Amino acid sequence: VVSHFNQCPDSHTQFCFHGTCRFLVQEDKPACVCHSGYVGARCEHADLLA
């Protein structure tokens, strides 16, 4: 089974402000899985509707 995500390298441990960093294998770039109540590419915004 091939995963689309890997753990982010150490160089990206602080990439996500309020979330977990995952590395997109096919796009070769980091992405964030935001904690509840946060949105944005790097989970940098509070979700005022949450």
Swiss-Prot record:
Residues of the signal peptide: none
Domain of life assignment: Eukaryota
Boundaries of every EGF-like domain copy: 4-44
Keyword Nuclease: no
Keyword Disulfide bond attached: yes
Gene Ontology CC: extracellular space
S-S pairs: 8-21, 16-32, 34-43
Entries under PROSITE patterns matching the protein: EGF_1, EGF_2, EGF_3
Tissue: Gastric parietal cells.
A single BP term in Gene Ontology: positive regulation of cell division
GO terms, molecular function: epidermal growth factor receptor binding; growth factor activity
Subcellular location: Secreted, Extracellular space
Record's keyword terms, sorted: Disulfide bond, EGF-like domain, Growth factor, Mitogen, Secreted
InterPro entries reported in the protein's UniProt record: EGF-like_dom
Record's function text: TGF alpha is a mitogenic polypeptide that is able to bind to the EGF receptor/EGFR and to act synergistically with TGF beta to promote anchorage-independent cell proliferation in soft agar. Inhibitor of acid secretion. Inhibitor of aminopyrine uptake in parietal cells (in vitro).
Subunit description: Interacts with the PDZ domains of MAGI3, SDCBP and SNTA1. The interaction with SDCBP, is required for the targeting to the cell surface. In the endoplasmic reticulum, in its immature form (i.e. with a prosegment and lacking full N-glycosylation), interacts with CNIH. In the Golgi apparatus, may form a complex with CNIH and GORASP2.
PANTHER family assigned: PROTRANSFORMING GROWTH FACTOR ALPHA (PTHR10740:SF1), TRANSFORMING GROWTH FACTOR ALPHA (PTHR10740)
Protein name per its UniProtKB record: Transforming growth factor alpha
Organism (species): Oryctolagus cuniculus (Rabbit)
